[in-house]
Amino acid sequence: MRNENVAGLLAERASEAGWTDQPAYYAPDVVTHGQIHDGAARLGAVLANRGLCRGDRVLLCMPDSPELVQVLLACLARGILAFLANPELHRDDHAFQERDTQAALVITSGPLCDRFAPSTVVDAADLFSEAARVGPADYEILGGDAAAYATYTSGTTGPPKAAIHRHCDVFAFVEAMCRNALRLTPADIGLSSARMYFAYGLGNSVWFPLATGSSAVVNPLPVGAEVAATLSARFEPSVLYGVPNFFARVVDACSADSFRSVRCVVSAGEALEVGLAERLTEFFGGIPILDGVGSTEVGQTFVSNTVDEWRPGSLGKVLPPYQIRVVAPDGAAAGPGVEGDLWVRGPSIAESYWNWPEPLLTDEGWLDTRDRVCIDDDGWVTYACRADDTEIVGAVNINPREIERLIVEEDAVAEVAVVGVKEATGASTLQAFLVPASAEGIDGSVMRDIHRRLLTRLSAFKVPHRFAVVERLPRTANGKLLRSALRGQTPAKPIWELASAEHRSGAPGQLDDQSASALVSGSREVSLKERLAALQQERHRLVLDAVCGETAKMLGEPDPRSVNRDLAFSELGFDSQMTVELCHRLAAATGLRVPETVGWDYGSISGLAQYLEAELSGADRRVTPQSARSGARALPLIEAQLNKVEELTAAIADGEKPRVAERLRALLGTITEGQEHWGQRIAAASTPDEIFQLIDSEFGES
């Protein structure tokens, strides 16, 4: 029997083609194809040593990285079914996935470990430590029809479902996109805004480079427009993959000079509007702009424009080895130019969902994508709409009814419809249309209350940030909601622009230097050193209050003091859009240039405040980003409080320094004893004198 294990076949292909020493990933260090496959084989041995075998299930919840690729390949090498999970999901979604898969092992990292059962979770770092001490394992002998991996759908018709793909499926993706659409070669470098847990991103950043000898730029944090521009200027990718929302932001916020190396642009996830496609053509200097359509069930793109033939406003043509047809409501084939449901048939289509009894395909092997399209005489496919009520925002399918059920729990709301609306840039965003339950109407405070509740109960990408009040919802003659009529509405202002009276009347959030100036020019006789120390402390308070105030506004919290300053932004309910918006607002408040990435780099209100304070002071050395608290696993308390001690040293008088230094030396002798309770006592201290008293009491010094 020929071994059709895809991990083994990809390693064999790299060896035979001479790619082993060629870059596979820039992350930012170079990782070669040979290192990827060798690491995967060693990790396969680790999984075998831990008792995992063919047919077991593993849940992978890791950020994009070469390490995720190696762990995925290790599972495939051993015949283990790997489920890919979005690490940015709400903890309830992760709990569902753990129950759904009944995984023998959950592989994740850092704070996410606390979200899963201790008996099954393992930190990926531990696996890599073990892999460094073992030799590579052989590849399990498998047929091409063996289950390989599964990616989750967006859950538009109920709970998310995992589409199971086989070992042979990968090579269908490669034939369709790499060979027929993109003409990828080992010289190509890809950069994808879509993540690896997403079927689109998995192909872009994993299967395509490994199967063609090309390489990919990967980043553990979300790749927004500005991040993409930075990565592109550094690594010079030739193919840029994304979704329409991403590309709309690229055109608005970036310089075309950063993307001079790009030879083609690939868009998928939702239809690319003609206007945006034309803007992209101008921005990128006339290179191919390739729109297409794919699905989680198919595994990647099956209809696309190509580098040889592309047309703005069209999804392109069907790519071999796939077949498509358009089906009219009566089940007959729709003629040229007639709108109908898009059906697809081909070798990579998942035959079933995990834990789902209903078949995916017809008896003839056709999958109904639920996309409505039409095809002209020459085979060009044009997108019309979704056949169901699914909203596609940022290339993610969202079930609006899940959101609507939560919103209508609010007594002030009689009816609600959540739809995707188009911003002026061409990007899509969720908006909730609210019908008041009484003549009192719905004001901004009610909208903020709804927004806060949604942030605590849904994954961030499902939460609408725009709300509009309407007298009634548009409906058909038989009472069915006309979502299409709402999609054309002008977007309302985002919730964070609906400033409450509390915010407008002087709550923290806007920097000024009046208090600080008063300290310097105070009437009492103080030394210059004391004045400068007081100024530094006041600046720290002002900056922290500004960040906390802006964060509270965006969350709709009337009292900034109620917001946890050490909790990760993701745990507060921020998604990528909100994090970027916060950076924009802080830039306006401080007059600084605040990169969009610092919200992720510094992770929390406290961390971001430290960064801004250093920038305002003109410090030569940038504050080192630190991990924010996420769930139960937080920045070690001792480390956090030592940072506080360091900040307060500016107020130490010269005469006190020897005494303080001696006591801190005594403290060093107790570090190995792990006295975390002492750090908790420091947390309650607010001045250097209080901290010194704690040191005195701890070590018995007078």
UniProtKB/Swiss-Prot annotation:
Pathway: Lipid metabolism; fatty acid biosynthesis
Name of this chain's protein: p-hydroxybenzoic acid--AMP ligase FadD22
Domain Carrier: 538-616
Gene name of the record: fadD22
GO molecular function list: acid-thiol ligase activity; ligase activity; phosphopantetheine binding
Family that this chain belongs to: Belongs to the ATP-dependent AMP-binding enzyme family.
Pfam families on file: AMP-binding (PF00501), AMP-binding_C (PF13193), PP-binding (PF00550)
Family matches, as Gene3D superfamilies: 3.30.300.30, ACP-like, N-terminal domain of ligase-like
GO biological process, one term: secondary metabolite biosynthetic process
SMART domains linked to this entry: PKS_PP
Reactions catalysed, as given in the entry: holo-[4-hydroxyphenylalkanoate synthase] + 4-hydroxybenzoate + ATP = 4-hydroxyphenyl-[4-hydroxyphenylalkanoate synthase] + AMP + diphosphate
Entry EC number(s): 6.2.1.50
Keyword Ligase attributed: yes
Role of this protein: Catalyzes the adenylation of p-hydroxybenzoic acid (pHBA) to form p-hydroxybenzoic acid-AMP (pHBA-AMP), which is converted directly to p-hydroxybenzoyl-S-FadD22 (pHBA-S-FAdD22) thioester intermediate in a CoA-independent manner by attack of the phosphopantetheine thiol of FadD22. This intermediate primes the biosynthesis of the phenolphthiocerol (PPOL) by presenting the pHBA starter unit for elongation by Pks15/1. PPOL is an important intermediate in the biosynthesis of phenolic glycolipid (mycosid B).
Presence of keyword Lipid metabolism: yes
Lineage: superkingdom: Bacteria
Enzyme class: ligase
Residues the record lists as O-(pantetheine 4'-phosphoryl)serine modifications: 576
Keyword list, A-Z: Fatty acid metabolism, Ligase, Lipid metabolism, Phosphopantetheine, Phosphoprotein
